[in-house]
Design a protein with these regions (language model features):
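Conserved P-loop/Walker A NTP-binding site and adjacent catalytic elements of P-loop NTPases
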Residues: 1
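Short coil/turn segments at secondary-structure boundaries
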Residues: 6-11, 40-51, 59-64, 86-93, ...
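Short hinge/gating elements
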Residues: 8-16, 31-33, 136-144, 288-293, ...
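Phosphate-handling DNA/RNA-contact segment within nucleic-acid enzymes
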Residues: 11-28, 47, 69-214, 232, ...
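Conserved short loop/turn motifs at secondary-structure junctions
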Residues: 12-14, 33-38, 62-67, 102, ...
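Non-catalytic interaction/clamp surfaces of large macromolecular machines
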Residues: 14-19, 26-60
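Short, well-structured beta-strand/strand-turn elements
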Residues: 52-65, 184-195, 335
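A charged alpha-helical hairpin associated with nucleic-acid processing machineries
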Residues: 115-116, 159-167, 197-403
């Protein structure tokens, strides 16, 4: 996802017609930004995209733009068109500076963010120059039109393919969506200014015509680094009916899809999606990978940590299957013993799970404790649990994603 920067200027108690005016303002400023991308001043923005392997056709399809130099260039342009400052502020296009109205974005590459109807409702902006002291990425602030918990970049281009193929690919950045699209994966979207959450999920479920049971595929692409592990754990903590149909694709060498396409070509991006693995398998294997299962102690520690994860799977047949797989993955001789421990863990009252999460949250990195019962929650002091602990922090901060 793209790091969010900016406050909230959300309009409330709007007058009749206000929504249409804000849509019109966003359309007008988008046309202005698109024309600016062709100017000599925007050479750095154009080169940013061209250097990442995007053709002019792909850049055109995504309707990229450029916010020019000058504090109020776009604002003055729209004021001359008849929009009021109040409308521009409510649309997230302008804000009040020390000396009057100014543009929200300056000297940045812009991606328009659209709703399902194809209306521009906001922008994502990428820093281009070192003397730009604001965040690397910025987004339109919250407005009547733009709700970061609901909008998905690229959805306007991907919606038909998502509906027809019953598949959506969730990536983490604007250029990742573009890379997927350029490589022929036309179902990719990204959240804008926040992590992928429950409301984003509902948007995709509706597109896949799923009113009762999720029968499509949702594929997460994660960087093969620590942040990617956190994202996977956060997704795993989401709605189980959905998670059972979700998959993970991890690019090699910590590359994101944009880097992968740039270095290894379109076919590598398509293979990344084709080689997806089930979300449950990815999370369990990630936990196991933190231990040395070539030792008895390592196998025991891996089992202690992985059993509570398997116990979270609500689908009972699937839970049994992964309990047996877990036994094989860690080299545990008696699969039935593992299954019994998973069932025992699953029967524990849910109230008992919350202190465990808080313990992870407050943990300090210290050597692991050894005198722990077979299926007792692992000590928060185990240093190798850091990625999971951080993932749980994120889950606590975003309860809408938690199951």
């Amino acid at each position: 996802h793209i790091n969010y920067q900016g406050g909230s200027t959300g309009a409330r108690n709007e007058k009749p017609g206000t929504r249409q005016r804000l849509i019109a303002a966003n359309k007008a400023v988008h046309e202005f930004y698109r024309k600016q991308l062709e100017t000599p001043e925007a050479a750095t923005a154009r080169n940013f995209l061209l250097d990442r392997g995007f053709s002019r056709e792909v850049i055109y399809d995504f309707e990229c733009g450029y916010a020019p130099e000058g504090w109020d260039t776009a604002t003055k342009h729209l004021l001359r068109m008849g929009f009021s400052f109040e409308e521009l502020e409510a649309a997230g296009i302008s804000k009040m500076g020390k000396r009057g109205p100014i543009d929200r974005f300056h000297r940045r590459l812009l991606w328009p963010i659209k709703d399902l109807s194809g209306n521009v409702i906001g922008f994502g902006a990428r820093k281009l120059f070192d003397d730009d002291k604001l965040g690397k990425y910025m987004n339109t602030s919250e407005t009547m039109l733009y709700r970061k918990s609901k909008v998905l970049f690229g959805l306007d281009l991907a919606k038909r393919n998502i509906a027809e193929n019953h598949q959506a690919v969730v990536v983490e950045g604007y250029t990742d969506v573009m890379a997927m699209y350029a490589a022929g994966v036309k179902t990719a979207v990204a959240s804008c200014g926040t992590a992928f959450g429950g409301e984003h999920l509902q948007v995709l479920r509706r597109l896949m015509l799923d009113d009762s049971y999720f029968n499509g595929e949702l594929i997460y692409t994660f960087d093969g680094d620590e942040a990617g592990q956190k994202a996977a754990m956060r997704a795993f903590d989401g709605e189980q009916k959905f998670t059972g149909q979700s998959f993970v694709s991890v690019a090699p060498d910590g590359m994101d899809p944009c880097d992968l396409r740039l270095h290894k070509g379109d076919a590598a991006v398509r293979e990344l999606i084709a080689d997806r693995i089930p979300m449950f398998e990815f999370v369990i294997q990630s936990v196991i990978a933190e231990y040395r299962i070539d030792t008895a102690e390592g196998r025991l520690q891996a089992l202690r940590r992985a059993v509570p994860v398997v116990a979270q799977i609500r689908d009972q047949p699937l839970q049994r299957e992964y309990a047996r797989r877990l036994a094989g993955w860690v080299g545990w001789a008696n699969p039935e013993e593992v299954l019994q421990q998973v069932r025992a863990e699953a029967r524990k009252p849910k109230k008992a799970e919350k202190p465990t999460i808080r313990r992870f949250d407050n943990a300090k990195q210290q050597p692991a404790q050894q005198d722990v019962p077979m299926i007792h929650p692992p000590s928060p002091k185990e240093t190798h649990l850091w990625p999971q602990r951080e993932a749980l922090k994120l889950a606590l901060q975003m309860p809408q994603v938690a199951g």
